[in-house]
Amino acid sequence: MGENEASLPNTSLQGKKMAYQKVHADQRAPGHSQYLDNDDLQATALDLEWDMEKELEESGFDQFQLDGAENQNLGHSETIDLNLDSIQPATSPKGRFQRLQEESDYITHYTRSAPKSNRCNFCHVLKILCTATILFIFGILIGYYVHTNCPSDAPSSGTVDPQLYQEILKTIQAEDIKKSFRNLVQLYKNEDDMEISKKIKTQWTSLGLEDVQFVNYSVLLDLPGPSPSTVTLSSSGQCFHPNGQPCSEEARKDSSQDLLYSYAAYSAKGTLKAEVIDVSYGMADDLKRIRKIKNVTNQIALLKLGKLPLLYKLSSLEKAGFGGVLLYIDPCDLPKTVNPSHDTFMVSLNPGGDPSTPGYPSVDESFRQSRSNLTSLLVQPISAPLVAKLISSPKARTKNEACSSLELPNNEIRVVSMQVQTVTKLKTVTNVVGFVMGLTSPDRYIIVGSHHHTAHSYNGQEWASSTAIITAFIRALMSKVKRGWRPDRTIVFCSWGGTAFGNIGSYEWGEDFKKVLQKNVVAYISLHSPIRGNSSLYPVASPSLQQLVVEKNNFNCTRRAQCPETNISSIQIQGDADYFINHLGVPIVQFAYEDIKTLEGPSFLSEARFSTRATKIEEMDPSFNLHETITKLSGEVILQIANEPVLPFNALDIALEVQNNLKGDQPNTHQLLAMALRLRESAELFQSDEMRPANDPKERAPIRIRMLNDILQDMEKSFLVKQAPPGFYRNILYHLDEKTSRFSILIEAWEHCKPLASNETLQEALSEVLNSINSAQVYFKAGLDVFKSVLDGKN
């Protein structure tokens, strides 16, 4: 195509020259020239005429004719003012050359007589016209036949049938999801995680998913030791297991898995005897208060889970000098869906990926660092009943009474001995990956992620919900694909392994294919733990995708009798979306049902992983209608991102989110506010000048749409800071929780510098945010400049 276009100007010039020779020859024909009588010149003209005819056939008649038509009467307009009315049309064997009488050397003011061969030429032209007409009619018949016999399921690229998505999603049924869920739960009772991975691969392949395969990584896992951890009261010598039961052989047999799997993966190992100091939630104010009245060096902190990321709180305790942590969940914070009598749980202290290969994939011959633990603290999760025994307090919650929080008085001393024993081993983590290849943009990926059972850990039943939902959508999608339809962009389906130990499977896969994913991933749709309650739909989305989620949720509301108002936010979430948010800057969407109590309580309780019997999915959603709703909402978002010509991302919403994060009385933000205003202006200009015209089908030039989509998919990458506090997102567009509306790294820095007149940490955080906003503003401006230069080039 490029070569053809490049040759057009040369073809035009050559044609013009040859036409010049042709007319010259015609004027020299015997009996028709009043000026030239030389026989040699006449023979030369006839030779030139033959050469011109041959070259015309080689260069292409259509191109030549088009080019000639465009330049008609333009060739000498700069040098000669022609009296066109006085020029009679010349007649030549090829009438398209009559314009060349206007050449300055051949201007005549007489009427030429018709050549003798006119009748023959007329017959020749008539034959061409008849042939062209027959071919045209034949082409119409072929087109009609092909159109009527093509599958009606495949709409043309660039147009989206509004009923297409509903046709795919209507095949998703709650009963099918329930059946799949029960099969998975039953499978978990009898087989290990590798067998479950094989079942998932077999099922996805049978549904028609393309190139379904295992992607395995050998990683370092921190597994439970041969015997459960213990906590012993020094005053009485009583020994307790993490669930509060006295240490005994009988207790171990009755609940062996609960006892073993109630641990903190990647904690330090060993024994520590020290005083227990209640630090509540471990906030900055809590630690300042405690350190004023007690020496905390090498002591044991009694810490509540929630309000801030666990890794951040442990980092603060480690810096303060603590030696161990007894971690628990206040019964007053527990959602109704969790039975407080079974609140043993597991946590992972791994920020993500294989700890022995930080930042690079665990492939063959990779260098492995020696990191059996990720903290110097001995960390042990314990139940609320055990906490009550440690502080000599009655139970915190009774059936009909109000809840009272557990609290150890500061004037009382409790000394305990805690023993933590885990084992680190190299194990294989398996991901299952398959895809549906895109039709027009196969190199652009929408990744849909669920996770499957992980051995040696608490998994509850959330993994079965996650897997059943992604399988239900694959079944619905492939039924359409088998009838000839394909999405414009490639949809990649992933079932991650090792999620409980720190999203290891997704991190390793992301690090393995980082260069490809950085360039090609458009969005990530998370199906992690979709049913955590049954009272409220709780969507989480990147700022650029919130408008799309609102539209889909409102449409879903019109189909249901009850639909309470839904708050859509960009907050930190658990699960395998972590790598895509914090290392690739990819927009994400996640739908989940929550318990109202959970939403009202402290955030980050979801960092705890409860046992199977503590969370009963079928009790929360007996009809599986909630599962069906999550599948359809997620599916509709997937289809729209995968199939719309213009990505349904909103640039202006990012700028508005930045401005909202800077509202209120915040110190040292005047520069940030000024930069945020410039970002908004650039985003508004980009939205009005580029995005709105692109939504008009008449303006959808393929190269222009591709350029626009490339800009849209990389918008959030500007907001990845180099380093964030432990447990905080590197992507600063995400808040800590729904109760905060400011940049999380600024909140942490302000808390850190409260007692100080000036603080380097605050200045560094302000600089990070300023650079991110400036980078985004420059990015939008550069995008506008690219479009402008392309338009100027065309003009």
From Swiss-Prot:
Main localisation: membrane
Topology, Cytoplasmic side: 1-121
Any one cellular-component term (Gene Ontology): membrane
Topological domains, Extracellular: 143-795
Compartments, record wording: Membrane
GO process terms (BP): response to bacterium
Origin: domain of life: Eukaryota
Transmembrane segments: 122-142
Keyword Phosphoprotein: yes
SUPFAM superfamilies xref list: PA domain, Transferrin receptor-like dimerisation domain, Zn-dependent exopeptidases
Region (Disordered): 1-38
Residues the record lists as Phosphoserine modifications: S92
Stated role: May be catalytically inactive.
Name assigned to this protein: Inactive N-acetylated-alpha-linked acidic dipeptidase-like protein 2
Organism: Homo sapiens (Human)
